[in-house]
Design a protein with these regions (language model features):
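Acidic/histidine-rich alpha-helical segments that form the ligand environment
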Residues: 80-117, 128-133
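Short, contiguous alpha-helical
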Residues: 4-12, 18, 22-25, 30-77, ...
């Protein structure tokens, strides 16, 4: 089980098959945070805020039997903002990282049987939820990197 925990943590942190979150988010210019390279794409902030919301939802689903998930899809995407303040950016980034650390801690918790069904669910295991986070974050980190490249901010 320890090898599986180690593998999950490495997968969550990235750097094996995709860019680590910290690297993807490093040195983003203020001007690029809320800019769309194309009208059909999201901004970096919109992608990160979506990641924060989805990650929080999955974390709370695992640890809080009373948690109610947002409505799909509108509850998982914030409305675009025209003026993104530093405070709003920091709230999104710090919220994402805070939950990310909680997820790593949960993966490493020896009291959690990764293969067990989450007690207040009917069929979902911790492993399933952690794998969804890995996949989802990897996908959106890739989109953030592409947006940064398109904005000449990579």
């Amino acid at each position: 089980m320890e090898q599986l925990r180690k593998h999950l943590v490495n997968s969550l942190k990235g750097g094996q098959a995709f860019v680590p979150v910290e690297k993807a988010m490093n040195n983003i210019s203020r001007a690029a945070r809320n800019k769309k390279p194309d009208e059909n794409l999201h901004s970096i902030w919109e992608e990160l805020e979506h990641m924060r919301i989805a990650q929080e939802d999955i974390l709370q689903y695992m640890i809080n039997p009373e948690w109610k998930s947002p409505e799909w899809p509108e509850g998982y995407w914030s409305r675009p903002v025209t003026d993104l303040s530093d405070e709003k950016w920091d709230k999104t980034f710090n919220g994402f990282m805070k939950d990310f650390i909680k997820i790593i801690d949960l993966v490493n918790d020896p009291k959690i049987d990764l293969l067990a069904i989450i007690p207040h669910t009917t069929a979902h295991t911790y492993l399933r939820e952690f794998c969804i986070i890995v996949e989802h974050n990897a996908y959106h980190v890739g989109k953030i990197v592409d947006i940064r490249k398109a904005l000449n901010n990579w």
